[in-house]
């Protein structure tokens, strides 16, 4: 398992303590420090000394955003499976055991990995449970009415067979579903209808600041919108991606956006709606800066 973190020393201990409590210690915790200037490094050094029955690896890098943390992690991971546990989240005491035992019984090269449940601290499932069948793609789950964040456990060999997340100068965010959507074209995920992660959405987390992310990272979002235009199965989802693509293109003043779009006619139809979204994003960011 790996955890990208940036200035989260104040909350990272919660994740560490949940790993100490694991009923199965057959895992490595890889911490990707994305340029923290708090005492994260010192904390981790102490945890390594504690020798709690599992290996801790620490890797420091210059700040680049969550997707660059994933790029760094995928280069370093050498286990068969990998799962990202965010710095403000933690695992139920039996999570590693659930994952490893389930994979031993059901895993094979046919699947890209496992999709499992995220829950809130009160035990409530985020969104909805997974369908009562053996496997699904991530995009197929959402296309068929699935809701809420889910925990994705991927085969390292599979996730590394797809291109890295692109890194755009001056930007700090590219949606993580880039690799997941590519994997969906070739594999399905085994369904594990059990909770393996307890989620807490922090005020300083990326999920809490989406309009600001749109404004600050238009190249990253526009890149991902083009990927969705190509691979999304539903027409309405392709059209929504065109709207967001137009908005992002206006933010970064890309005059060639129509030429560069993989769905030119649909992008043209989406233009008025994209302008409206662009104005909303601008207004929200001005309000946030006030």
Name each region found by the language model:
Residues 120, 124-208:
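Conserved nucleotide-sugar donor-binding catalytic segment
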Residues 209-235:
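Catalytic core of nucleotide-sugar-dependent glycosyltransferases
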Residues 18, 33-43:
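A conserved acidic beta->alpha catalytic loop
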Residues 61-77:
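Glycine-rich, basic loop-to-helix element that forms the pyrophosphate-binding segment
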């Amino acid at each position: 398992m790996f955890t990208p973190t940036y200035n989260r020393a104040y909350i990272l201990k919660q994740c560490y303590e949940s790993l100490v409590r694991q009923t199965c210690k057959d895992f490595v915790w890889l911490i990707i420090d994305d340029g923290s200037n708090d005492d994260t490094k010192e904390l981790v050094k102490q945890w390594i000394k504690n020798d709690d029955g599992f290996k801790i690896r620490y890797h420091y890098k210059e700040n680049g955003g969550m997707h660059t943390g994933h790029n760094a992690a995928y280069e370093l991971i050498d286990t068969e499976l990998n799962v990202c546990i965010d710095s403000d989240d933690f695992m139920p005491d039996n999570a590693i055991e659930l994952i490893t035992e389930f994979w031993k019984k059901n895993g094979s090269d046919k699947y890209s990995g496992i999709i499992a449940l995220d829950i809130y601290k009160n035990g409530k499932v985020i969104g909805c449970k997974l369908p009562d069948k053996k496997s699904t793609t991530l995009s197929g789950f959402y296309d068929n009415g699935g809701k809420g964040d889910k925990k994705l456990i991927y085969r390292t060999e599979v996730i590394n067979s797809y291109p890295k997340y692109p890194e755009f100068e001056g930007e700090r965010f590219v949606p993580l579903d880039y690799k997941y959507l590519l994997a969906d074209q070739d594999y399905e995920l085994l369904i594990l209808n059990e909770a393996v992660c307890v989620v807490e959405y922090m005020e300083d987390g990326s999920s809490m600041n989406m309009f600001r992310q749109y404004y600050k990272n238009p190249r990253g979002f526009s890149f991902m919108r083009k990927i969705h235009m190509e691979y999304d199965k539903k027409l309405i989802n392709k059209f929504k991606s065109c709207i967001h693509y137009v908005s992002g293109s206006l933010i970064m003043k890309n005059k060639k956006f129509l030429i560069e779009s993989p769905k030119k006619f649909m992008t043209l139809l989406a233009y008025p709606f994209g302008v409206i979204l662009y104005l909303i994003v601008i207004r929200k960011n001005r309000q946030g800066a006030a």
